[in-house]
């Protein structure tokens, strides 16, 4: 089975549509969204509608949790809170109820899907370094063979043995025996790795291969919608830079 995995759409329908179109040529059997459908961008309902239609399941992200009233988001900076408040007002009742019901984690066989670190799921902790990934050695026995995460907006992979963690730098690789993996799948709608293309990924359960993919999209169209909305202009400007 080929699973199309993506995360951190952040209300960017232009990027999401480009990713969905790109997936169509990849013989995908199932789609999974790892959260943060909303926040930052100008098209929260449109993104919810598409993801509800295509994804087999969606994981709760921190921005989703904030909009749905499932977490205290007072620690967010002012512009991010403003976007969350705006999206909470804009979402249809159906989309709001959907966000309220999203799970923190889904496990399927030897695969785990969660938005942030698999430790303390409700805390949405980041993993973008070997040091942060090393904390997962504490829960080695509970880890799936592959744990897919989002949250950092970075494309990062870490391979774990029982006593060691190292970063995997390849964009396509085979899951090796006697190892476990934590894979951060990047961001569809707000990449932060200085590559402004939307990120999406593919995991083949038969071949046991994982691959990062990128696709260009109408950044100007997405940014112009942000500029026209009651949103921080920098949320649009940063799309051009991928930061």
List where the protein language model places each region.
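Active-site neighborhood of phospho(di)ester-bond hydrolases with catalytic His/Asp-centered motifs
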Residues: 6-7, 31-36, 57-62, 146-151, ...
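Anionic-ligand binding region
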Residues: 132-173, 178-182
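Active-site environment of divalent metal-dependent phosphoester hydrolases
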Residues: 10-15, 39-41, 65-68, 119-121, ...
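Beta-strand-turn-beta hairpins that frame and shape the catalytic cleft
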Residues: 1-4, 106-113, 176-181
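N-terminal active-site segment of His-dependent metallophosphoesterases
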Residues: 1-54, 227
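Short, glycine/charged-enriched secondary-structure capping and boundary segments
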Residues: 18-21, 46-49, 72-75, 127-128, ...
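Active-site neighborhood of divalent metal-dependent phosphoester bond hydrolases
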Residues: 53-120, 124-143
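Acidic, His/Gly-rich catalytic cores of divalent-metal-dependent hydrolytic chemistry
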Residues: 160-243
């Amino acid at each position: 089975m080929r699973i199309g995995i993506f995360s951190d759409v952040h209300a960017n329908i232009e990027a999401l549509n480009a990713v969905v179109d790109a997936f169509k040529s990849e013989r995908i059997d199932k789609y999974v969204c790892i959260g943060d459908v909303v926040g930052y961008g100008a098209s929260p309902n449109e993104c919810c509608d598409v993801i509800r239609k295509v994804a087999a399941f969606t994981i709760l992200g921190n921005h989703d949790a904030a909009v749905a009233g499932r977490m205290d988001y007072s620690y967010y900076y002012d512009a991010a809170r403003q976007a969350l408040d705006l999206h909470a007002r804009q979402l249809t009742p159906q989309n709001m109820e959907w966000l309220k019901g999203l799970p923190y984690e889904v496990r399927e066989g030897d695969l785990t899907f969660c938005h942030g670190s698999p430790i303390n799921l409700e805390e949405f902790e980041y993993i973008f370094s070997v040091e942060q990934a090393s904390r997962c050695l504490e829960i080695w026995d509970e880890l799936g063979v592959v744990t897919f995460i989002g949250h950092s907006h970075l494309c990062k992979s870490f391979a774990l043995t029982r006593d060691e963690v190292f970063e995997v730098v390849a964009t396509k690789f085979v899951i090796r025996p006697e190892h476990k993996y934590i894979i951060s799948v990047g961001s569809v709608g707000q990449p932060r790795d200085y590559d402004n293309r939307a990120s999406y990924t593919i995991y083949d359960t038969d071949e046991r291969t994982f691959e990062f993919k990128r696709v260009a999209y109408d950044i100007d169209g997405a940014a112009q919608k942000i500029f026209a909305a009651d949103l921080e202009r920098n949320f649009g400007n940063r799309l051009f830079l991928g930061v």
